[in-house]
Amino acid sequence: MAKGQSLQDPFLNALRRERVPVSIYLVNGIKLQGQVESFDQFVILLKNTVSQMVYKHAISTVVPARPFNVNSHTAAPSPAGGFNGQQDDNNDQ
């Protein structure tokens, strides 16, 4: 598994599993809002009043509306205990 996928997949899966509302900013500046319904290697299915298939190469930023735990269903939690919108200053991994 590629290094980029090792963070991206658990992050998106936790957003999906916990039904966290998100704002997705595209590279052209457009803001989309909804919940992650599903995702794969290339796209994210974003659900609001309608479902939208958003290509990952068009995404700049994914912003959760509330704190959530990325590792709530995995065996080895990170030292930060999950993603809460704060960057972990402990980069000695």
Swiss-Prot record:
<dbReference type="InterPro" id="IPR047575">
    <property type="entry name" value="Sm"/>
</dbReference>
<dbReference type="GO" id="GO:0003723">
    <property type="term" value="F:RNA binding"/>
</dbReference>
<comment type="subunit">
    <text>Homohexamer.</text>
</comment>
<dbReference type="GO" id="GO:0045974">
    <property type="term" value="P:regulation of translation, ncRNA-mediated"/>
</dbReference>
<keyword id="KW-0346">Stress response</keyword>
<dbReference type="Pfam" id="PF17209">
    <property type="entry name" value="Hfq"/>
</dbReference>
<feature type="domain" description="Sm">
    <location>
        <begin position="9"/>
        <end position="68"/>
    </location>
</feature>
<keyword id="KW-0694">RNA-binding</keyword>
<feature type="region of interest" description="Disordered">
    <location>
        <begin position="70"/>
        <end position="93"/>
    </location>
</feature>
<dbReference type="GO" id="GO:0005829">
    <property type="term" value="C:cytosol"/>
</dbReference>
<dbReference type="GO" id="GO:0043487">
    <property type="term" value="P:regulation of RNA stability"/>
</dbReference>
<dbReference type="InterPro" id="IPR010920">
    <property type="entry name" value="LSM_dom_sf"/>
</dbReference>
<comment type="function">
    <text>RNA chaperone that binds small regulatory RNA (sRNAs) and mRNAs to facilitate mRNA translational regulation in response to envelope stress, environmental stress and changes in metabolite concentrations. Also binds with high specificity to tRNAs.</text>
</comment>
<protein>
    <recommendedName>
        <fullName>RNA-binding protein Hfq</fullName>
    </recommendedName>
</protein>
<comment type="similarity">
    <text>Belongs to the Hfq family.</text>
</comment>
<dbReference type="InterPro" id="IPR005001">
    <property type="entry name" value="Hfq"/>
</dbReference>
<dbReference type="GO" id="GO:0006355">
    <property type="term" value="P:regulation of DNA-templated transcription"/>
</dbReference>
